[in-house]
Design a protein with these regions (language model features):
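Substrate-binding clefts and catalytic carboxylate motifs of secreted carbohydrate-active enzymes
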Residues: 1-199, 204, 217-221
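Solvent-exposed serine/threonine-rich low-complexity stretches and specific carbohydrate-binding patches
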Residues: 129-140, 240-257
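Exposed beta-strand face motif in extracellular beta-rich ectodomains
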Residues: 153-157, 208, 274-278
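Conserved structural position at the C-terminal beta-strand
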Residues: 161, 214, 282-284
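Short beta-strand elements
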Residues: 169-178, 290-300
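Short aromatic-acidic-glycine turn motif
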Residues: 180-183, 232-248
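Short, solvent-exposed loop/turn segments enriched in Ser/Thr/Gly
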Residues: 204-210
Length: 300
């Protein structure tokens, strides 16, 4: 709130029976309200402009659905290159990665948001791994968030959540290898052609969102080694835009070339009035050949 008290506005709903609910302004980042420059819009929302959920948004999972099993590890540290947001609307920098830039074993804050009764942490990189870290009771912490300070050493942080003494969930933070490839995920690989009269009734099913992720040789997302990528299209398809979620970008919103942001990017495509097979080609820094996603356009 305005006094910089760590008290999420949702708690006012929980604590006061006469409040029916609340609205989160806003749910998704948007352009046009700098917060602050060089951000070109509002960048403190649970979802960025690619509709990727921010690590800061994990607060809402146990808050809004306490009956569901949930456990998520994130690191809170100022090493993460994130837009800061405006004053008391901003979140502290967080990311769900253990690929940190430190080599001196300094402590960082690990947060575990959970609906479990207790969580046991395993930290084999500790100087005395034979001594297990004692279980933490969720009730002893605020916001369903267990915090622990751990040295930023190479390896793995494992959290096991328990309910009524039984294991129900696990999550981990591990060090990833260098970028070895790119994974493409399209929400639609088959589209309808746009009507020749551009009738709005036929607009459904004409847009595909293709998310790209830098991966290591194990297929895990590498968030901390950004690469420049360039987009080209072939066939009956048109490029609507390229986005990464970083509101501080200096490039035009019509650019075909950006740098990944925490290992990811998003390409928006739309069919034309023609049918056939279209191809999205993504050229990534460090790779000789493009990564290709095919999109089929046909009448339905």
């Amino acid at each position: 709130m305005r006094d910089f008290v760590e008290h999420n506005p949702w708690h006012f709903v929980e604590e006061n029976s006469f409040i029916a609910g609340s609205f989160a302004w806003a749910g998704v980042d948007y352009l046009g309200e700098s917060s602050p420059w060089p951000a070109k819009g509002w960048c403190s929302c649970p979802f960025d402009m690619t509709l990727k959920e921010r690590p800061q948004a994990v607060f809402y999972h146990p808050a809004w659905k306490p009956e569901e099993d949930y456990l998520k590890l994130v690191v809170r540290d100022n090493c993460f290159d994130q837009a800061v947001g405006t004053d008391h609307w901003q979140y502290p920098p967080m990311a769900d990665t253990w690929d940190l830039p430190y080599t001196d074993s300094r402590c960082v804050e690990v947060r575990c948001y959970t609906t479990c009764d207790s969580v046991q942490f395993f930290f084999p990189m500790w100087s005395n791994p034979q001594l297990p870290l004692k279980p933490r009771r969720t009730a002893d912490y605020r916001d369903n968030c267990i915090t622990i300070q751990l040295p930023a050493r190479q390896g793995k942080v494992l959290a096991i959540g328990y309910k009524d003494g039984k294991e129900v969930m696990r999550d981990s933070l591990v060090n990833h290898g260098p970028v070895a490839g790119l994974r493409l995920e399209a929400d639609r690989t088959t589209l309808s052609p746009v009507a020749k009269d551009y009738a709005p009734a036929t607009a459904f099913g004409t847009v595909s969102h293709v998310r790209l992720r830098l991966i290591d040789k194990e297929g895990r997302t590498q968030q901390m080694q950004p690469r420049t990528f360039r987009v080209e299209t072939e066939g009956p398809i048109r490029l609507l835009g390229v986005e990464t979620g970083d509101m501080r970008r200096k490039e035009s919103w019509r650019t075909t070339e950006l740098k990944t942001y925490f290992g990811e990017g998003l390409v928006r495509l739309q069919s034309t009035t023609a049918t056939g097979t279209a191809r999205l080609l993504i050229y990534v820094e460090g790779f000789d050949k493009p990564f290709i996603q095919e999109i089929t356009i046909k009448e339905h």
